[in-house]
Amino acid sequence: MAEIRKLRNYINGEWVESKTDKYEDVVNPATKEVLCQVPISTREDIEYAAQTAAEAFKTWSKVAVPRRARILFNFQQLLTQHKEELAHLITIENGKNTKEALGEVGRGIENVEFAAGAPSLMMGDSLATIATDVEAANYRYPIGVVGGIAPFNFPMMVPCWMFPMAIALGNTFILKPSERTPLLTEKLVELFEKAGLPKGVFNVVYGAHDVVNGILEHPEIKAISFVGSKPVGEYVYKKGSENLKRVQSLTGAKNHTIVLNDANLEDTVTNIIGAAFGSAGERCMACAVVTVEEGIADEFMEKLVQKASEVKIGNGLDDGVFLGPVIREDNKKRTLGYIQKGIEEGARLVCDGRENVTDEGYFVGPTIFDNVTTDMTIWKDEIFAPVLSVIRVKNLKEAVEIANQSEFANGACLFTSNSNAIRYFRENIDAGMLGINLGVPAPMAFFPFSGWKSSFFGTLHANGKDSVDFYTRKKVVTARYPAPDFN
């Protein structure tokens, strides 16, 4: 039997062994094959990374912005050249199908492209005359060492909306990727190095609690970007803020989709199937609840269940597979527990994800509950799995009121051709990202990404202009030039 490879941290431009003696298996969730082992690193590892990044910041922050942008452009080119390999790594680590993995790679590349626009993004502004012979100018500067804590569900896209922008703007970076999906990160490092990145600018430390707390507490780390669950995200925001760091924390979701009587049902059902069961439901933009008007509810449910029954489940590397596994055995058990809870609390199970799935990996099939109510656990909790709840409503107003009862407010979608309904939805729904006649309202990199309420803690969102503000600080220079006598 071949020896399982143990991964190393990437610090100061080198792959270095962690100080830990604790390693965890990285498993292909579709086959249960052990791919490698990842170190559960120590505070000592974070200390080394933070000091390295702080030292590198002294020179990297002074590098001309166009030169930094050229390195990001080189990185974008290399990512594009290796997109199939990157997608393959995502599929074997995360489980999503090849098409979805390629889509994620594309979104990651898009974020790098946006970051490569740093010369424009870093520009300040000025006013030639604020008083007699006095002018003022506003300059942007990098903030320092930044820490990023990324989840397993988008191992390329999420880190790529963190470190490329931060680095392009002159910061140095320490990434803690998910210990469940480290191989993709290893490839990103390899390509970024080839793009010309100097030592110490980008560092990777694998791990769990000690690494997270090290990032939250180290005085050299000035800002933290987090994506993950609500309990951890709330802790990250509180602890980071307590230590006087700038923090953005993108957390849980329970996204509602509203279907009105005038919706094109074929198109609507196709979009909802993709939104609810794509990436095995393990995404913060997944459709978790559908509220459908009573007039079309029966027809909608018939089409929805039929479409769900046609979904091909299996290894994401196999042709035609749409739904891959959830990430680990614990996630599967948790999901099965929610299915049982839904039955016990009175929801009607119309598509049972426990049936017709193999035990070879951590598979759960498309699961649909009808006649769900807002007092049920499956409506309240973020399940993060291919489980969809359906509620029948009288009208749009009731649907919006139901959605607004959720503690989460990441995204919401509406299917209709009625412009008045669209306006009402836009003005009254509590959510940060809205979709009209589409299933997943994730915006492009140049728009901010994140929600409201318990889906986000902080003031500046990821991506868009918010990300530029998050990773920079401003310096205002007011200058007086006494009028010369040129006579």
From Swiss-Prot:
Enumerate the residues binding NAD(+): 150, 152, 176, 179-180, 229, 251, 382
**Cystine connections:** none
Per its record, what are the GO molecular function terms? Answer: malonate-semialdehyde dehydrogenase (acetylating) activity; methylmalonate-semialdehyde dehydrogenase (acylating, NAD) activity
EC no. given is: 1.2.1.27
Keywords for the protein's UniProt record, in alphabetical order: NAD, Oxidoreductase
List the SUPFAM superfamilies hit by this protein, alphabetically: ALDH-like
Q: Which GO terms describe its biological process?
A: inositol catabolic process; thymine catabolic process; valine catabolic process
Q: Which reaction does it catalyse?
A: 3-oxopropanoate + NAD(+) + CoA + H2O = hydrogencarbonate + acetyl-CoA + NADH + H(+); 2-methyl-3-oxopropanoate + NAD(+) + CoA + H2O = propanoyl-CoA + hydrogencarbonate + NADH + H(+)
Biological or metabolic pathway of the protein: Polyol metabolism; myo-inositol degradation into acetyl-CoA; acetyl-CoA from myo-inositol: step 7/7
Under the heading Pfam families, the entry gives: Aldedh
Enzyme class label: oxidoreductase
InterPro entries cross-referenced by the UniProt entry: Ald_DH/histidinol_DH, Ald_DH_C, Ald_DH_CS_CYS, Ald_DH_N, Aldehyde_DH_dom, MeMal-semiAld_DH, MSDH_GmP_bac
Q: Where is the active site?
A: 284
Q: Which Gene3D superfamilies match?
A: Aldehyde Dehydrogenase, Chain A, domain 1, Aldehyde Dehydrogenase, Chain A, domain 2
NCBIfam families, A to Z: MMSDH (TIGR01722)
What the entry lists under PANTHER family is as follows:
MALONATE-SEMIALDEHYDE DEHYDROGENASE
Q: What does this protein do?
A: Catalyzes the oxidation of malonate semialdehyde (MSA) and methylmalonate semialdehyde (MMSA) into acetyl-CoA and propanoyl-CoA, respectively. Is involved in a myo-inositol catabolic pathway. Bicarbonate, and not CO2, is the end-product of the enzymatic reaction.
- Which family, according to the similarity comment? Belongs to the aldehyde dehydrogenase family. IolA subfamily.
The entry describes its oligomerization and partners as: Homotetramer.
According to UniProt, the name of this protein is Malonate-semialdehyde dehydrogenase 2
Source organism phylogeny: Bacteria, Bacillati, Bacillota, Bacilli, Bacillales
Q: Which gene encodes it?
A: iolA2
